[in-house]
C-alpha cells in the first residue's frame, strides 16, 4: 500500500471514530486514549512499552487531525458523508447535497419502540416493515428471513424509483445494514439511521405485549449480535433511549 493511501485511510479512521462524539457527547478520542493507557498500565505484559508508545503516536495523529476533544467540523453533512464513504474530498469544502429526499432506517431490538417512534415522528410516510412482510408471508422470526428481506427490498425499490420518502422498519442490528444504506443511496436518497434502545426488562415487557411477540431466547441472541450504528454509517445517525 502506498504511503499516501495509508495516511489517507488512517486519517479517515480517526475522523470516523471522533464523529461518534455527535452520538455520545461525553465521548472523545482524548478519553479513549486515556482509557487505553490506563488499561495497559494496569496489566503485566512484555509489550507494555511498545503499546504505550503506540498510544502516544495515536495522540499525535489525532491532534494533527484536529479532533482530540470534539468531532471534526466538516464543511457540510454531504462532505462528511462523502469522506466517510471513502471519497477523496477536501473536508472543509461544502459539497452540494443533490439527494432528492431522506429515507429513514430504524435500528433496534424487538420491543424497543420502533413502531411507536415512527407513528410519532413520521406521520404520512410509507413504511416498509419487515414485521408486516413476515405476517403476509407467514414466516416466523425463527425461520429463514431471506424471502422476507427480498420482498421488503423490492417494495423499497418501488418507492425509490418514485423518489418517495419512506421508513425502512427493521431491527437492522449489524453492520450488514450497510447493504440497505447502499441501496437507498444508489437511488439518490440520503439516509438517516435511527437507533432505539431501552432497558432489558422494559424491552421484554414491550415485546410480550406485541401481536407478534418474538421468543425471549431469540431476542437474547439478537442482543449478542447487536452492533449499534456508528456516526459514519449514514449522512445522519441518531441514538434514542426510550
Indicate where each model-derived feature is located.
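C-terminal subdomains that position terminal phosphate/3'-OH groups for nucleotidyl transfer/ligation
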Residues: 1-87, 92-94
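Glycine-rich phosphate-binding P-loop
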Residues: 102-122
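Acidic, metal-coordinating catalytic cores used for nucleic-acid/nucleotide bond scission
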Residues: 168-180
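Conserved phosphate-donor/acceptor-positioning beta-strand/loop module used by diverse small-molecule
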Residues: 187-206
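Conserved substrate/cofactor phosphate-moiety recognition/catalytic segment
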Residues: 115-166, 200-205
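Short catalytic-loop micro-motif centered on adjacent basic/acidic residues
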Residues: 165-170, 193
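Conserved GTP-binding G-domain of TRAFAC-class P-loop NTPases and closely related GTPase folds
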Residues: 104, 124, 201-242
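Phosphate-binding P-loop
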Residues: 93-100, 159-160
Amino acid at each position: 500500500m502506498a504511503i499516501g493511501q495509508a495516511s489517507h485511510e488512517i486519517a479517515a479512521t480517526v475522523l470516523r471514530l471522533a464523529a461518534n462524539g455527535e452520538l455520545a457527547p461525553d465521548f472523545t478520542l482524548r478519553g479513549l486514549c486515556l482509557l487505553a493507557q490506563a488499561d495497559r498500565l494496569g496489566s503485566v505484559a512484555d509489550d507494555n512499552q511498545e503499546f504505550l508508545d503506540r498510544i502516544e503516536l495515536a495522540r499525535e495523529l489525532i491532534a494533527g487531525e484536529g479532533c482530540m476533544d470534539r468531532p471534526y467540523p466538516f464543511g457540510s453533512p454531504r462532505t462528511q458523508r462523502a469522506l466517510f464513504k471513502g471519497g477523496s474530498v477536501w473536508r472543509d469544502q461544502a459539497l452540494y447535497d443533490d439527494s432528492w429526499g431522506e429515507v429513514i432506517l430504524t435500528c433496534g431490538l424487538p420491543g424497543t419502540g420502533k413502531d411507536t417512534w415512527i407513528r410519532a415522528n413520521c406521520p404520512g410516510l410509507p413504511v416498509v416493515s419487515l414485521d408486516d412482510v413476515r405476517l403476509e408471508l407467514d414466516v416466523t422470526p425463527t425461520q429463514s428471513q431471506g424471502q422476507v428481506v427480498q420482498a421488503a427490498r423490492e417494495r423499497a425499490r418501488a418507492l425509490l424509483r418514485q423518489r418517495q420518502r419512506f421508513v425502512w422498519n427493521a431491527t437492522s442490528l449489524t453492520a450488514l445494514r450497510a447493504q440497505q444504506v447502499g441501496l437507498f443511496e444508489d437511488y439518490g436518497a440520503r439516509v438517516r439511521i435511527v437507533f432505539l434502545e431501552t432497558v432489558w426488562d422494559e424491552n421484554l415487557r414491550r415485546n410480550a405485549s406485541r401481536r407478534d411477540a418474538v421468543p425471549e431466547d431469540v431476542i437474547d441472541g439478537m442482543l449478542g449480535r447487536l452492533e449499534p450504528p456508528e456516526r459514519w454509517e449514514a449522512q445522519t445517525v441518531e441514538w434514542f433511549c426510550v
